[in-house]
């Protein structure tokens, strides 16, 4: 059984006037992509995600509970209205199916290569003929989708970062694309710490794109009723820089 990370709020911390004070709030699933380490063992949800969800829970009084799943399954559950999908890009295809929150923060899309076989990216033409590993079921910004299958091809059958990096190490793909709020050097150091292998990983200096990290909710879901509450909380956290301060703290962390 998957471990659930409960993000709850004591009644004394509820916002003034909250209708949830003094009672147990209904659980709201926050669906995130699961990950495993280099040996295939499940990894806990990243501190950045748990921290952001915790801030939202504290700011709204909602009982937000993180549920890690393979990304394709997380999307299917969200489409069925069974939770909030964390981190899905607002592509035209998804906009027909989901409503989206205001941006939580920004994340860049970085290319990772073996240090022994780097590539340069300044324009999309630099990726002509390349095979790029993306997250299973991943969809991205307009430019990426325009070049997908034309300038370059994608491989999206590997579900975890560890399995994607394994494909990269044996030459099945030319690069792995990862989303992160970190800069290139910081992400590179983290990957080499978490996924040490025969060689080192290099992150290409220029990102493919930078997009907002959003929460998505199916248009047919009753969870649309909490979207205004979440957006108001996101506005308050933006003014207080609560999320930004949390991410900055993660950038200075000494552990992986």
Identify the function of each model-found stretch.
Residues 7-16:
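Bacterial N-terminal signal peptides
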Residues 21-97, 240, 249-250:
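Extracytoplasmic small-molecule ligand-binding "clamshell" domains
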Residues 32-35, 107-110, 193-231, 252-256:
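Periplasmic-binding protein-like
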Residues 33-37, 42-46, 90-91, 115-118, ...:
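Short coil/turn segments
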Residues 47-59, 125-131, 212-247:
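Extended ligand-binding regions for polar small-molecule ligands
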Residues 51-60, 102-103, 137-159, 165, ...:
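Ligand-binding cleft/hinge of the Venus flytrap
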Residues 59, 68, 72-83, 99, ...:
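Short helices/loops that flank or line small-molecule/ion binding pockets
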Residues 66-126, 137-140, 205-208:
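Acidic, polar ligand-binding/catalytic clefts
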């Amino acid at each position: 059984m998957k471990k659930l990370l409960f993000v709850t709020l004591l009644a004394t911390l509820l916002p003034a006037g909250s209708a949830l004070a003094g009672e147990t709030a209904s659980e709201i699933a926050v669906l995130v992509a699961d990950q495993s380490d280099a040996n295939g063992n499940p990894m806990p949800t990243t501190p950045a995600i748990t921290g952001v969800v915790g801030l939202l829970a504290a700011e709204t009084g909602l009982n937000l509970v993180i549920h890690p799943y393979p990304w394709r399954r997380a999307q299917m559950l969200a489409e069925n209205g069974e939770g909030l999908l964390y981190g899905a890009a607002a592509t035209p295809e998804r906009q027909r199916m989901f409503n989206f929150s205001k941006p939580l923060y920004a994340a860049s899309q970085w290319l990772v290569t073996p240090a022994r076989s780097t590539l340069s990216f300044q324009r999309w033409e630099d990726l002509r003929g390349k095979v790029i590993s993306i997250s299973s079921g991943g969809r991205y910004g307009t430019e990426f989708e325009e070049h997908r299958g034309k300038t370059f091809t994608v491989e999206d059958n590997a579900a975890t970062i560890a399995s994607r990096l394994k494909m990269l190490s044996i030459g099945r793909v030319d690069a792995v694309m990862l989303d992160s709020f970190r800069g290139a050097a910081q992400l590179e150091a983290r990957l080499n710490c978490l996924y040490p292998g025969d060689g080192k990983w290099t992150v290409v200096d220029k990102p493919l794109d930078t997009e907002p990290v959003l929460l998505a909710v199916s248009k047919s879901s009753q969870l649309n009723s909490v979207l205004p509450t979440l957006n108001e909380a996101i506005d308050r956290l933006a003014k207080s820089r609560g999320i930004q301060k949390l991410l900055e703290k993660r950038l200075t962390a000494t552990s992986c």
